[in-house]
Amino acid sequence: MRARRFWIRTARAALLIWLAAAGVAGADPPQKEVWPEVDTWLRLSPVWRLSVFVPVSKNLETYYREGNLILQADYAWGESNRTRRLIDEDRARTMDLWLLRGGYLGGKSLDDHGAAYTEYTAFAELHLRVPLKGGVLLSHRLRSDLRWLGEGDSEFSTRLRYRLQAEKEFTAGRGSIVPYVSVEPYYDSRYETVNRVRLITGASVAWSRRAAIETNVTYQYDSRSSTKELFALNVILHLFFDASRTR
């Protein structure tokens, strides 16, 4: 019964997201993209973890493509009494309430060797996880980006992002599914305003300690971009390795 209620609430939240997206919509139809991605995770200890993300984006109408390489290090603390699998975990663990992440992102347009788009970014994130009744997890993420855009004489800017996300784990045998919904506004120093908002709904499915599949649908509105509206299908393969278990 709880699972059914959660699914109903998740569906309602997703519906509200699409209605909000439609209300923001302009005259031009939204662009459509696919975002395949491979995320590799290496756990060094119960609190330290490294990761490498390789996402690619492709516009289904113009065939424009971008690729990124993301390197990250995580430190978690504030152990709780809750055991659960998070979206980016291979299995259920005792959850830490706080997580600090630092990383680097390098990105380029793929068909012109970076002429249309080149980015180098250093970023830091602070995560706070708040368990709610019924097994629902509410998480806050605050992220700060230091960005260098363009080749050669690159333009420096900063960006602040805040993400609010709700998720809940369901289990069946050895399998685990974690549906989620999130909203994330972006503040860009180039425009001195919140110019972008992302609305996401999806799920992560794990069946072993080595792999999980995550898929989501993203709606993005950006008031300062040539592509003001965007719908994207994101499919992520998570690969997990645990060096702490060999010690």
Task: Indicate residue ranges for each PLM-predicted region.
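Repeated loop/turn-to-beta-strand initiation elements of outer-membrane beta-barrel proteins
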Residues: 47-52, 79-84, 95-100, 133-138, ...
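Transmembrane beta-strands of outer-membrane beta-barrel pores
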Residues: 54-60, 104-110, 130, 144-148, ...
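Outer-membrane beta-barrel "beta-signal"
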Residues: 73-75, 126, 229-247
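Residues that define the transmembrane beta-barrel architecture of outer-membrane proteins
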Residues: 32-34, 65-69, 118-122, 154-160, ...
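Transmembrane beta-strands of outer-membrane beta-barrel proteins
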Residues: 37, 49-55, 72, 86-87, ...
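Detector for outer-membrane/organellar transmembrane beta-barrel domains
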Residues: 135-184
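Residue-level signature of outer-membrane beta-barrel architecture
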Residues: 42, 75-77, 92-93, 128-130, ...
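Short glycine/proline- and aromatic-enriched beta-strand/turn motifs that initiate or cap beta-hairpins
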Residues: 25-68, 238
